[in-house]
Structures are given as C-alpha cells and as structure tokens.
Amino acid sequence: MNVAQIIAAKRDGKILDDEDIRRLVAGYSDHSVPDYQMSAFAMAVYFQGMTTHETAVFTKCMVDSGERLEWPAGHTIVDKHSTGGIGDKVSIALAPLLACCGVRVPKISGRGLGVTGGTLDKMESITGYRTELKIDEFRSIVNKNGCSIASASKNLAPADKRLYALRDVTGTVPSPPLITASILSKKFAEGLDSLILDIKWGTGAFMKTIQQARELAELMVHVGNEMGVKTSALITDMNQPLGNMIGNAVEINEATDVLRGVGPSDVTQVVFALASRLLVQAGVHSNLKDSEHKLNQLIESG
C-alpha cells in the first residue's frame, strides 16, 4: 500500500502489515512522508488503536530510524520513564541516586507535552546546563559520572523526535500505542538492560482513569520485554500535584531536597519505590528490603 492507503486502512480499523509500518516510518524519517500525512496517521491511531504486535513493529521501526548507544561490557545500563504529570520531578532525583548504586543511567528525556512540564525544560533552568549533547559526549559523561540527563540526539530515534512534537499540536498525545512507541523507541536507543515505567493516572496525568493506566502499563511492559529489555511498571496516582513546587527552577530545588533527605514525602516515596524495584530487576540487589536499605544509607550519608 502507498501512504494514503496505509492511513485509510488504519482509519477503517484494519491491522497493518509489518512492511506497511516500516514503509511509513522510513518515509517519515527521510521526509518523503510529510507532517500532514503523519498527522492523519496519528489521528487514525488515536481513534482506532494498534494491536500489541503493530505497536512493537512501529516501536522497532522508530528505533531503527537512527543509531543505538553501545556500552562497555560488564556495566548494567538502566533507566526509568514517566508518562508525566503535574509536578513530576522524580527523574531529577532518581538518576543520580541510581548512579550511586553502581548502575549507569543514560537518561534521554523530553520536553513539555500537553499540560506536563518536561524534564529537559527543568534541567535547563540550571545555569550552564546543556541538554543538547553529541552522542560521544553523552556517552562519556555517563561513563564518567554514572548518569546524564539529555535530549535525544538527532541520530537517536529521529523519527520519534519529529512525531513527539507533532503529537503535541495535533491532539494525539493520549494514545497508548503512540505513547508506547515514543517512550520505548528512545529507551531502546539508549542500549538498556532494564527499564522501569512510572505510569501515572488521574486529573493531572494523560491517563485519567486507573483502568487506562493499567492498559497502557500492560502494553508497554509486553512490548518492552518482547523486544529484549527487562521491563516493569508502577502505576502511581496523579490526582494532585506531586510535591509542593510547580515550575522548572523550583522543581529542581525540590528534587535536590529529596537527595538531601528533606524532600516532600510523596516525591521521596515514588523515587524510592521506582529505584528499589529497578535495582532488584537489574540484579543489583536480590530483594526490595536490601535495595531500600541501600537507598536510605545513601540519603543519610549525603
């Protein structure tokens, strides 16, 4: 099928062949498929959805549109991703905390999407902090410091970078297949061993009901594990803002408060829940009790 036929097929609720999905993403990557056609496809997916297999193929094609990071043998590479919510500054505290546990966290983050603030926007409120890094520079920082938070290089999942911006202005943000493909394509391009997902639901999240969040979590975990990355998810409440501060600079302050042991209890609880489970999942600790004990030691010791 040509691109117009692919759009029409999805509009009518048909299941797309692998080759049709590959053709669409490849065309979008080389700019032979314009934004208006991809917008139409995104809206068709929003209303008709995708099967788990379609989503997995779409995700793989997004990864294959660019490079993948490679890491030295013997290092455990992990990451976390949140679907976003009001006041969500968890990643800013979580990445360095995980790095102190001996794993490496190459955190590729995004900008504000819909009503939620983006981690990159928050990090850029730190004077002199650069989020636009070349792949070699990003890799070097992670190898030296254990973690880095940066934007996706133009060579990492480039098709997603364009689609991510397109969804924000076309009313197609809250689509489980598109959310899954966007998040996981960036994560898989990082060269991860383990991934944990923070799927938020409620009035301040994209998923308004816990059932929607559960369905998204199941889809993402299935696709992630099918593609060879150990993947799990937590479903967390976003019916009220996370923490006490809303705004890029003040959320940085609140995240550092968590690392100093004086942060808001709700933010600290989410950080610890995600970190402890990810460390067990990655094989750093054998159980949650040991994992939580190590995290508490790190916070108390400064």
Regions found by a protein language model. Give the residues of each.
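Phosphate/diphosphate-binding glycine-rich loops and adjacent basic-rich segments that engage nucleotide
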Residues: N143-E190
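A glycine-rich helix N-cap at a beta->alpha junction
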Residues: K122-S148, E218-G224, G228
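Acidic, glycine/proline-rich low-complexity segments that act as flexible tails and inter-domain linkers
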Residues: M1-G87
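A glycine- and small/hydrophobic-rich beta-loop-beta segment
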Residues: A4-I15, V223, K230-G302
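Alpha-helix C-terminal capping segments
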Residues: F47, A93-P106, K186-G191, E226-M227, ...
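Glycine/serine-rich anion-binding loops at beta->alpha junctions
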Residues: T76-A99, V103-V115
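Active-site-proximal beta-alpha loop/turn segments in soluble metabolic enzymes
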Residues: A42-V45, D160-V169, D198-M207, M238-P241
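Functional cores that coordinate and move charged inorganic groups
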Residues: L195, I199-M238
